Amino acid sequence: MSAAVSIRGLATRFDEHWVHRDLDLEIEAGELVSLVGGSGSGKTTLLRQMVGLLLPTRGEIRVLGEPLFGGGPERERALRRRFGVLFQQGALFSAFSVFDNIAFPLRELKRLDEATIRDLVMLKLDMVELLPRHAYLMPAELSGGMIKRVALARSLALEPELLLLDEPTAGLDPDRSDSFVRLIRTLGRELGLTVVLVTHDLDTLAGLSTRVAVLAEHRILAYDTIDAVLRIDHPFIRNFFLSERSVRALESAKRLGD
């Protein structure tokens, strides 16, 4: 398999503070990878760099085989259409209906007629387990779980190869969180997506991840399956994964995923 995301020699500095130094990461196509780390470890910063919202101080990021930065605005836009992004709060347009939020990236293409756009919007709603009547609600009328699903539908509108998620279950109660994790896992498998997510939630991590990338000491400290990472003897890994609460959460999530 080819790499969906390849990061080499990445460094990130804000003023005098180094967030990343000599960070390398290679994510194969079809993987579901969780980025985890302590507060200030740079996991959300790294995701923002993968999305193209933030330039690194140095280093290279390649997405779907192409350099993420450089080559001109048109080439960068074409590449970014090949991946979808779900931000932590959903980032829906508050003045747009659910329908128009999902239709927004389709209309931006300026290639599709409204009948085709309508069919695609309804298809994406069905994919995230929402009903046609939900298309005509406004974001203020949605529950937190529905906002996440609408945002996910919008991120899938252009049929991406790569899906980038920032804290996808933040703010959801345990039942809605478990349901959303199952949905992402199912869509990842059925659509052949590569999924990269930032999470601090161990239930989400265990329920979704084929691999885990642990950020600590300004770099990727470990990158492997959960079971392999748990065998690494390092203070951060012990504190993050092997506390009594963490072990219970991982065991519970694994049972749900089996």
Where are the regions that the model predicts?
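The feature captures the beta-strand-to-loop junction immediately N-terminal to the Walker
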Residues: 36-38
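Conserved catalytic motifs of ABC-family nucleotide-binding domains
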Residues: 159
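Catalytic Walker B motif of ABC-type/P-loop ATPase nucleotide-binding domains
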Residues: 163-166
